[in-house]
Amino acid sequence: IQTPANSVFQANGIQASPRLPQLMAADQLVYFMIRDAFPGRPVYFSRTAGGYPYELGLERYVLTQGMAKKLLDHEVVAGRDTVMIPGEGLVDINRSKALWDSVFTGTKSLAARNGWVDDASVGIPDLYVISGVTLAEALASVGRLPESDSVFKQARGIATAMRREKVFGFDRVQPPSAQPGGDTAAAPLLVQPPPALCWQPGLC
């Protein structure tokens, strides 16, 4: 269906204005799930979905946790453990770090490889690199530099093993560090994802 002008989706604490010119059946299904099952059943958007939650107008209600964005029933606000990362949105630092350390167990095996099997599926290890870089920047922004450096090196190790250091710009940037003469805030990383994996419209 054509998206009506100034239309708003409202349900369970969420008020979203879709940016899509047309609402396809799949788009309507997502709204139906939010209306009928959320928040009793959680809703997550995979990183592979790119900017889809933004297209649905849900950007104020999603929080990045590792490789997914979790939908909340209230607007997400920045805080001590929730920081805004340009191009990514608000990131849950502690949950993302726990996932990186204990759930994303593929980091070591990926870093030990010598290239990837084919270009068509190289997005799989790329997801680890992007998630690691995002987490490293988030950790650095709150002064957790040793943890940031560790995650950054792990992400870079995966990119190196996949022979994609230049794709992610690791040959041009250094790990985040504290601002001289300032507080513990770190300079933002300059690493950008490859165009095919850009997750926020207008920034690629």
Q: What annotation goes with each model-predicted range?
A:
Residues 1-178, 184, 189-191, 198:
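ER/secretory pathway lumenal C-terminal domains and tails of membrane proteins involved
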